[in-house]
């Protein structure tokens, strides 16, 4: 039997989380708002002053090259400057985007996947992408509520996150160091933490969310391919 406080918590949770069909009806992703992907990219650049400056420099250099292409000395200087400015722009974009990959953002994405259990290509990914866009904007992590252009990019990001964290964990697994010390160390002195292999992350909290989300996604992919090829009877 639930206590009054538990009933209140359930009601509050229900109020805080609208029903799925209402969320789906109000979901508008950047692909629905912008005419094209390039107009979306230009909008994102225009909303961020550092990126805007780094973007305008190559544009100005291209214009200067068209005006001074007959003067060899100036042309060489401008071309070198253009190449360097493009490299700086790419580094700036990479650094700017990588700032969003903090623990809070990753756990929020994993919680969305665990809660909604999205099917492969399912509408749940639209809701997840929308919620993540709002989360990043509301917390000041991203300058617009348009981080994920569409649900497919959100899904692709999630899969790359699982793959990347898994490979990083294998490279930094404590068992690598433990194997080198076990020959000179009694078995009783080797702690359980020392020989425990990490599947995704050495952070136990992040590890738990990653494992659960990966299991849900694996089940969704298995179900998707089972429906695609029903004649193959898999266990």
From Swiss-Prot:
Transmembrane segments: 51-71, 73-93
Span of the signal peptide: none
Function per UniProt: Does not confer resistance to killer toxin K28, a protein-toxin encoded by the M28 virus that uses S.cerevisiae as a host.
Note in the entry: Present with 1695 molecules/cell in log phase SD medium.
Keyword Cytoplasm: no
Naturally occurring in which organism (per UniProt): Saccharomyces cerevisiae (strain ATCC 204508 / S288c) (Baker's yeast)
Subunit text: Interacts with ULP1.
Region Disordered: start-end pairs: 169-189
Protein known as: ULP1-interacting protein 3
Keywords: Cell membrane, Isopeptide bond, Membrane, Nucleus, Transmembrane, Transmembrane helix, Ubl conjugation
Cellular compartment(s): Nucleus membrane; Cell membrane
InterPro entries: DUP/COS
């Amino acid at each position: 039997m639930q206590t009054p406080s538990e009933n209140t918590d359930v009601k509050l949770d229900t109020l805080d989380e609208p029903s799925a069909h209402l969320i789906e009806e109000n979901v508008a992703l950047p692909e629905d708002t912008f005419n094209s992907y390039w107009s979306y990219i230009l909008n994102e650049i225009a909303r961020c002053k550092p990126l805007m400056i780094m973007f305008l420099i190559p544009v100005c250099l291209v214009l200067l090259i068209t005006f001074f292409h007959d003067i060899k000395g100036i042309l060489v200087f401008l071309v070198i400057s253009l190449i360097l400015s493009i490299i700086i722009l790419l580094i700036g974009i990479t650094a700017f985007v990588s700032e969003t990959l903090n623990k809070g953002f990753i756990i929020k994405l994993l919680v969305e996947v665990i809660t909604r259990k999205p099917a492969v290509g399912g509408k749940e990914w639209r809701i997840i992408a929308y919620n993540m866009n709002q989360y990043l904007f509301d917390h000041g992590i991203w300058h617009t509520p348009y981080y994920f252009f569409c649900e497919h990019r959100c899904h692709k990001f999630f899969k790359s996150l699982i793959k990347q964290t898994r490979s990083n964990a294998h490279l930094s697994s404590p068992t690598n160091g433990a194997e080198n010390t076990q020959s000179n160390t009694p078995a009783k002195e080797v702690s359980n933490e020392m020989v425990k292999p990490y599947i995704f992350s050495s952070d136990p909290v992040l590890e738990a969310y990653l494992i659960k989300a990966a299991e849900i996604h694996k089940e969704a992919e298995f179900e998707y391919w089972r429906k695609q090829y029903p004649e193959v009877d898999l266990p």
